[in-house]
Amino acid sequence: MQNRNIFSWVKEQTTRSISVSIMILIYVITWTSISHAYPIFAQQSYENPREATGRIVCANCHLANKPVDIEVPQAVLPDTVFEAVVRIPYDMQLKQVLSNGKRGSLNVGAVLILPEGFELAPPDRISPEMKEKMGNLSFQNYRPTKKNILVIGPVPGQKYSEITFPILSPDPATKKDVYFLKYPIYVGGNRGRGQIYPDGSKSNNTVYNATAAGIVSKIVRKEKGGYELTIADASEGRQVVDIIPPGPELLVSEGESIKLDQPLTSNPNVGGFGQGDAEIVLQDPSRVQGLFFFFASVILAQIFLVLKKKQFEKVQLSEMNF
């Protein structure tokens, strides 16, 4: 009886351990897939998202060129919170190819490269009106040491094709490396999935070309989607197998003669990446005060001139009457 109880206890503990192990494994796999699906591959591969040529590195994976727009104030005062509005326009009716080959809505993402000293505004400095414009977005620093570079995404494009960044301007009085100057701001924005992964491999959201010339001798439709094409290369007497993942639409058929690099599929990509820039002036408050003083003095001078002119006209009129 005692041996039976011990056996039951051991069986129960073993079952529990296996269940916990499976749960941990599922969590690790899920977490890894989510993190790798996050379109911040640039953070993993590049210290700075903007190359010396001015090109933003997101364009290495998102090959199609699409527009993006940024709107910022012409000038801001030190230690002031302002809005940087990034617009990523696209046709909301479009559906993109997902990693499993099915169709789904497009996500969007953006990277905002601010001047040194500018950074994401703290929550207690953001007004309720600005929070309402931001929605439920959560911004990140590109690097812990690069607070002036912000990233966001992927987020649903139908809800966030216009993204409001809350920015805090620096104060040269407390930051000695910041000056009252005109500064550039750079932005990159993408809609939809990329065509190339950071390791150089293709996603299923791009065109697949023939890796050899010859005759398509066999096409096998795979159980989980996609195709396996066998190309008979008569010139070299060999067979080449091209694997096409689920998503792209096949354009060739068995028995068809194809050339090297000929497209085997359609291009399913409906998204793309764009970059833009803007300028902002960090304005010295004393200059603003001086400008107001100048305008006030000009207005007063004009008033005095008008009064003096009227007084002179009255004197002339009285002399004529006399």
Swiss-Prot record:
What this protein needs as a cofactor is: heme
Residues at which heme binds: 38, 58, 61-62
Q: Which PROSITE patterns match?
A: CYTF (PS51010)
Q: What is the annotated signal peptide range for this record?
A: 1-35
Q: Name one GO cellular component term.
A: chloroplast thylakoid membrane
Where would you find the membrane-spanning parts of this chain? 288-308
Q: Read off the Gene3D superfamilies from this record.
A: 2.40.50.100, Cytochrome f large domain, Single helix bin
Q: Main localization of the protein?
A: plastid
| UniProt topology in membrane | Single-pass membrane protein
Pfam families assigned: Apocytochr_F_C, Apocytochr_F_N
What are the UniProt keywords, alphabetically? Answer: Chloroplast, Electron transport, Heme, Iron, Membrane, Metal-binding, Photosynthesis, Plastid, Signal, Thylakoid, Transmembrane, Transmembrane helix, Transport
Compartmental location? Plastid, Chloroplast thylakoid membrane
List the GO biological process terms: photosynthesis
**What does the note under cofactor report?**
Binds 1 heme group covalently.
State the superkingdom.
Eukaryota
Q: Name one GO molecular function term.
A: heme binding
On assembly, the entry states: The 4 large subunits of the cytochrome b6-f complex are cytochrome b6, subunit IV (17 kDa polypeptide, petD), cytochrome f and the Rieske protein, while the 4 small subunits are PetG, PetL, PetM and PetN. The complex functions as a dimer.
Family membership: Belongs to the cytochrome f family.
Instruction: State the HAMAP family in the record.
Output: Cytb6_f_cytF
**Protein's job:** Component of the cytochrome b6-f complex, which mediates electron transfer between photosystem II (PSII) and photosystem I (PSI), cyclic electron flow around PSI, and state transitions.
The protein's name in its UniProt record: Cytochrome f
Origin species, per record, is: Nandina domestica (Heavenly bamboo)
Per the UniProt record, the lineage of the source organism begins with:
Eukaryota, Viridiplantae, Streptophyta, Embryophyta, Tracheophyta
